Amino acid sequence: MKRLKYIFYFYCLFIVFINTAHSESYSLEKAFDGLNRPWGMSFIDDHNLLVTQKSGEILKINLKTQEKIELDHNLKVLEVGWQGGMLDVLFHEGMVYVSYTEKRYGKHTTTSIAAGKLVNDRLENFKNIFRSDPPVDTDIHWGSRLAVKDNYLFASVGERAQGMAAQDPTNHFGTIIRLNLDGSIPKSNPGLTTNKDWLPEIYQIGVRNPQGMAVSPIDNEVYITNHGPKGGDFFGKVSKGSNYGWMLVAWGGTDYDGSIIGDGSAWKPGLLKPIYRWIPSIAVSNMIFYQGERFPELNNKVLVTSLKAQKLISLDYKNDKV
């Protein structure tokens, strides 16, 4: 769990002011400087980590020596608007996984995932293992966070501003997908078992733009943080074959002009209910479950970053309640 300590430490570099639910105060120490719009990070060991920059770079950084190496790749990364580009990165057992905005044709793009082996500061056999479909010409809501649980790769795919398309499991809009680590499709996925009308990669539907994802070291479940519209950001569990309901519901939020979404309900029977919601929105970004020695008061807490408030928020989550 030492690595989680460093992850928490590094996330603090990008936060101007930190606050928790208990109003604790923390001082920051700069670990590395000179990054250009960093988006994702993943530790290789105690000193080395991978960092993505939205403009398309994958960097290997040594915090001890301050050395920075750019890893070559041939991905068609397109930095779109203020959300798209090279996004998350995950290092797992020698493999590097990245999610990114891929230019497919014209201005049409998708959330895609590539993987390859890291060997002597080189990415070998680095190629796409997933491309969300269909490509669309919008510049928001990519999702794209990555996590590994039980040798499965989980990834979030935003609904790309396609609204009710998040209720149509014959496309990838507004979904959580699950792959084997080599990119193949698990035979136990809903589309191959209980939900035969779903695309085979899809594990869960009905999300809007999940930019946070983490596996809990306590119960070994996958959790997400999801952007609502004007209100309705939430923290919740990833559950096989379930539906969070976007945009039948908006989790307590409204459209940006103040109009209701669906019938105005925050939740309906038959849909998966978020564990915790923020109204008004805080613009939730990434999250971790903290376990470490440096901040014992935060042990087993859920730490959530807020883009809007530029704060780090601590949730005391136990027994499916906050």
Indicate residue ranges for each PLM-predicted region.
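Beta-propeller domain segments
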Residues: 84-86, 159-322
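Bacterial N-terminal signal peptides
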Residues: 9-17
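Acidic, Gly/Ser/Thr-rich repeat motifs that build Ca2+-stabilized beta-propeller blades
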Residues: 22-163, 215-224, 228, 280-320
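Bacterial N-terminal signal peptides that target proteins for export
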Residues: 1-9
